[in-house]
């Protein structure tokens, strides 16, 4: 048994050409950035459009602490994130920043505005920086999700830091390795 090839060889890799979501506001942004990509020769707009198509997992949130870290010494620039900006209580003082994002959590928005900064939407950004001038394009940490901690070499093999799926955090479950016969080995 072979594989059925479409005329012209193997099937190409798939990539999104539109967002999966039915969010009408997202669709309006896609419409706007499609226009900008078509009419301007700007790579920035093409990247924004591609990221608007992405799934939620690939639009990782960014905390205020990381945002502050990335924006030090770039006071005149606008931070751009296709995703959510979340608050971080570990940061006590934040500088005045201009930030564009799809979403801001309530506290993050309040803190940015209180510090004298601005929270912009992507349609406002398109008016201010149609070609992405003076912007810093950022991404959140994709691999910080809880689920990702379980990926990798099997837990229990040497040098593996993979988190096991444990049904219970009790005394005799995965905590007892090396302490009882039934849990691997006993020393």
From Swiss-Prot:
The keyword Cytoplasm does not apply. GO terms for biological process: translation. The keyword Ribonucleoprotein applies. One of its GO terms (molecular function) is mRNA binding. Residues 165-187 have a biased composition (Basic residues). Keywords: Ribonucleoprotein, Ribosomal protein. Residues 150-187 are annotated as: Disordered. GO terms for cellular component: cytosolic large ribosomal subunit; cytosolic ribosome; plasmodesma; plastid; vacuole. Coiled coil: none annotated. Belongs to the eukaryotic ribosomal protein eL18 family. This is Large ribosomal subunit protein eL18x. It comes from Arabidopsis thaliana (Mouse-ear cress). The gene is RPL18C.
